[in-house]
A protein has these predicted regions:
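Conserved short acidic donor-positioning loop in nucleotide-sugar-dependent glycosyltransferases
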Residues: 10, 22, 36-39, 61
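Glycine-rich, basic loop-to-helix element that forms the pyrophosphate-binding segment
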Residues: 57-74
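Short, acidic, metal-binding catalytic loop of nucleotide-sugar glycosyltransferases
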Residues: 20-29
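A conserved acidic beta->alpha catalytic loop
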Residues: 35-44, 83
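N-proximal low-complexity "stem/linker" segments adjacent to membrane-targeting elements
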Residues: 1-21
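Conserved nucleotide-sugar donor-binding catalytic segment
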Residues: 128-209
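Short aromatic/hydrophobic "clamp" motif used to bind/position activated sugar donors
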Residues: 79
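Conserved donor NDP-sugar-binding/catalytic core segment of glycosyltransferases
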Residues: 87, 91-122
Length: 247
């Protein structure tokens, strides 16, 4: 069985989209866990008659703690954490993942399709480059070429929890720990769709530049003895400075 955790916050329509993408799958042995930080009862009421494990946080936990609370509830052998603004695009998404796991992989990375207004962007980079970054996951600290959390599926035995000291690069640091020293495969035919630009999007509510600096300093200290991570952070900083000079 695979557990799909859906953290939610005050957006019933996006939650419906995420949930419907799960129940339309050809693989039906799925545990759906909804961890709700909402200030309204809309999602709670909608879930009353659904075959889901629903938990409402009162008071709200905040984004990262809410994600961790969902991970702790998972009972499946495999896990996906899918935010309410994400969805599984292809109906064989889960069965394709399970095939990879049966072939001995520990982590499966899927492709990403970003929706922003009327525009759609498929993929973040060439597939060969994504495979390179996945094979050497410390490179993700230079740039996120994976996408959102739903692009990662993993065996529960290798579960990692989000570092609650982080905000902006919390997902990247989590990806690194999940993939480091594991057998990872990129499934380019599996697609996650991600809705950007909506009011509740976490990145819309952060001072990104300031938070990125705070997170980078924290990671630099956390990985004091990891030269690859530290070098990746240095390269990211160098590239950012070059881009500013060009502009």
């Amino acid at each position: 069985m695979i557990s799909i955790i859906i953290p939610t916050y005050n957006n019933l329509e996006l939650f419906k989209r995420a949930y419907n993408s799960v129940i339309s799958q050809d693989e039906k042995e799925v545990e759906v866990i909804v961890v709700d930080d909402s200030t309204t009862n809309d999602i709670q009421n909608y879930c009353l008659n659904l075959p889901v494990r629903y938990h409402h946080n009162s008071p709200a936990l905040g984004a990262v703690k809410n994600w961790n609370s969902g991970l702790k509830l998972a009972k499946g052998e495999f896990i996906i954490l899918m935010h309410h603004d994400e969805a599984l695009k292809n109906k064989n998404f889960i069965s394709s993942l399970l095939h990879c796991f049966k072939n001995g992989y520990d982590v499966v990375v899927s492709n990403i399709e970003v929706h922003l207004g009327n525009s759609v962007r498929k993929g973040l980079c060439p597939n060969w480059l994504k495979r390179l970054f996945i094979a050497h996951s410390y490179l993700l600290f230079v740039r996120n070429l994976v996408g959102p959390c739903a692009c990662i599926a993993f065996k529960k035995e290798y579960i990692k929890y989000f570092d609650e000291n982080l905000k902006w690069v919390v997902d990247l640091e989590w990806y690194y720990r999940l993939m480091n020293k594991r057998k990872v495969v990129f499934m380019q035919s599996n697609w996650i769709t991600s809705m950007h630009g909506h009011k509740g999007q976490i990145t819309m509510n952060l001072d990104i530049c300031n938070q990125a600096k705070i997170d980078s300093m924290y990671i630099f200290d956390k990985y004091e003895h990891n030269i690859k991570v530290r070098c990746s952070l240095f390269v990211k900083k160098l590239v950012s400075r070059i881009v500013k000079l060009i502009r």
